[in-house]
Structures are given as structure tokens and as C-alpha cells.
């Protein structure tokens, strides 16, 4: 407890899923948190549910729009006075064979997963440098490091995040540490996306059982990851325990990708 005292964190895509888990973990460790999300109502609801843990705020923001992100930074400075943690978590999932994936899906993935991260980094970089001893955490994916069929576009966006991550680790040093997290197969969000829901209906049983078998067959640690696993990694990277780590891309996937 208390590993993140005097941390003032902005978390994009913080209203649900991994972002919410990170917000909860940061609050539990003493940070103050501003949850930014495209769904402002859900962000406010999440903040209300987490306020028992500490000081938490909500703000509606479309990370693909510079004006929205600038307004977010202004609000963060208003409520915190400074920002020393930015977690670029907002993102979309999307899959499809390269010959079949729709143009609007391509545009959405590029805009949110890559352009949105770049805009947030651009706006918050001077704020973080001014805060000193600051941290930027960029959410990538193991698909940014390894190829999977149907994930060419998604993987391209996440590989782009890793390229930016390395460059900014040099550009923003020594005032800001810049690291990425590469999640593996997250149990809470993967069932429908990977077809396990529909497969379970055809074969009988349940999606969870299919996921467990998949983990045993494909993941060295033989288990799916959870949003809380990613949140714990974000706490580590945001804490003094990681003070000598920058430019890293932390795999949190049970050994599916090793580098």
C-alpha cells in the first residue's frame, strides 16, 4: 500500500476493462486518478464506484481529437496541479484477413490505437517533463511483437506504439520514464473476440472451459491473464521500484512472447 503516493495519473480508456483495473489499483496504492473515456457517463459511473478508494475524477475525451486531449490536459492540471503519470490505455480490438478487413475498421484501429496514443503523448509530454520524475505507460500488445493471422492491422498499430515508446524514452529522458505493457490473452475480454463464445454453443460446454484448454495448450504458464495482472504491472512501472527502467516493453502474457 502507498507505493504511488504523490502520483497524479491520467488514464485514457479508464472506464472499463484494463483501464478500470488500473484506476482501481492506482487508487489503492495512494495515487489520485483522472479517468478519461469516450463514454463520459461510464467514466463518471466508474469514478463514483471507486471514490471510496481515493481521489478520482472523470472526463469525457475522444483521444483521436487534439482539442479533446488538450481539454483533458487542462482539466488534469486544474484538479491535480500537475500530472506525473500518463497511461495511454484507450484502444480498440479488431481482426480480419488483410484481403477482407473493412476500410472503416482499418481507419478506426489506426485512429484510436496509434494516432490517439501519439496525440496524448504530444499533449502531455511537456506537462510530464515539467513535473519531473514522471512516467508514461503505453498499452501495446503481444501482437505488436509477434505475427498472428487476422491481426495484421491491429498488430501494425501496436507495433507502432512500441516504435513511439522507444523513441520517447530517449526524447523525454531524464525527466520522464517511458515504458509499454504488452498484454497476453486477457480472459475478461477475449471470449467473444476469439470466437470462444460461438464455439462453445456449437460444441457444448462453456467459453471459459475452451479458454482454459487453450491456455494449457498454448501458454507456458498454462493460464489466461486478467485485467488485474495488467494493472499490477502498471503499478510497478509507475512506482519507484521501476526507477531505472525506461524504453521497455513488458510482456504480461504467461510466456507466449519471450524477448
Map each language-model feature to its residues.
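Alpha-helical segment proximal to the catalytic Tyr-Lys
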Residues: 126, 169-174, 243
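Short C-terminal tail/terminal secondary-structure segment
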Residues: 3, 146, 234-235, 246-259
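Substrate-binding pocket helix/loop in short-chain dehydrogenase/reductase
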Residues: 97-98, 102-110, 196, 215
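Residue(s) in the substrate-gating loop at a strand-loop-helix junction
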Residues: 141
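Active-site helix of classical SDR
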Residues: 121, 157, 165
